[in-house]
Amino acid sequence: VWVMVGSLVDLAGKAGLGKAGPSGALSRLAGLPRSVFGTFLGHFGIGLTTLGIVVVSIFGTETVLSMKPGEKTGLAGYELAFDGLTPVEGPNFTELQGAFHLSDSSGQNFATLISSKRTYSARGMPTTEAGIETIGASQVYVSLGDKGPDGSIVVRIWWKPLVTLIWLGAVLMVIGAVF
């Protein structure tokens, strides 16, 4: 956070904010060399990326549980419900799709996640496609595991708060490098 604040303070200082008044600061800001903006964006991007990494590392969660259709689990103030499994035949694979829906604290559904486990017929190699939902700057990932004899399936759920800041920061660093 201090890198981002420092970048903002540095840019405001170079623009003369507080000395020249708002209109004078804007005209000074417009007259600054492009490299000043590149430096600002690069350092601000480093701060965003670092913030995203730290928050995900400290507050991110991973839950592994067995779920049957109709079962629900809590997730960072939301509720994730397992709707069921659907077999799908593709041109060169068979797939088991799991449907999940997310609801907020009032019970209102706002997202459907589809996760799947594929097996390709040529090699018999299984792969997993995660269901992903972005909520603000955070993301939920849902991945399917093995199916149980009782109709349940192992589900792995990740909550990654502020994970998109990692990518946003990287984009700002790239834009800053172009300046």
What are these regions (language model features)?
Residues 1-179:
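Solvent-exposed, non-transmembrane regions of integral membrane proteins
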